[in-house]
Amino acid sequence: MKVEALETNWKQNVKCWGGNSFQAQRWFAYLVKQYTSKERKYHSLNHVIYMLSLAEKFKANVHNWMAFYLAIWFHDAIQNKLKANEKLSAQKCLEAIDELNLPADAHEAAQLILATESHRASESSDAKLFVDLDLAILGSSKEEYRRYARQCRAEYKIPNFLYRRGRIKVLEKFLQREHIYQSDLFRKRYEYQAQKNLNWEVEALKKGVSL
């Protein structure tokens, strides 16, 4: 999907929800700038496009599409080495919602974004679906997953031994859970492959094999 198509879709949605057209243009420009930063290898505009495309397939299962859509766009708006990325991204989302003059229901987007910090959702079905959507890449094909793993590595300018140690810790936390995915919808479609992919990467990292 080209940037022009993304922009058209963004503006149409904001207009449909009664938002401010001028602010829609400004915020879209901000988001594109954030996601096309040269430091971004995985958490880029392609990641947003991937999530938007997949979300359309599950749209019938989403209760608050406005919040869901906004959360996709803003969930990685702030991406640096700090631990507060999710919180800062959620705050930026709320700022945009207020300036866009969107309905009160849009504020739920912030909670969806915050749920990605631990990828353990509350009882909210939308939150479960959203965190699963953010992790959908884990259940992708072997080739696609390896590309994702390499992109994640490229975002960290640290020695290999430090990256491997931290990455293994993160992946093993997911593998220690009863399920990687929160929703039945994603478990049925992606759980098995996600388990295979994560186990492969952990073993590769422990052996020092190139991803």
Where do the language-model regions lie?
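His-Asp-centered metal-binding catalytic motifs of divalent-metal-dependent phosphohydrolases/nucleases
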Residues: M51, W65-N80, S89, L112-E117
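Divalent metal-dependent phosphate-bond-processing catalytic cores, especially two-metal-ion Mg2+/Mn2+ enzymes
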Residues: M1-V14, T36-H43, L54-N64, N101, ...
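Alpha-helical scaffolds flanking conserved acidic
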Residues: V62-I72, D105-L112, D126-L129
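Short, well-structured alpha-helical segments
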Residues: A24-V32, L45, I49, Y69, ...
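Active-site metal-coordination segments of metallo-dependent hydrolases
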Residues: S37-H47, I78-Q91
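An amphipathic alpha-helix signature
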Residues: E7, K11, Q25-A29, L52, ...
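Non-membrane alpha-helical segments in proteins
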Residues: K33, S37, A71-F74
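Histidine- and acidic-residue-rich, metal-dependent catalytic cores
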Residues: S89-S122
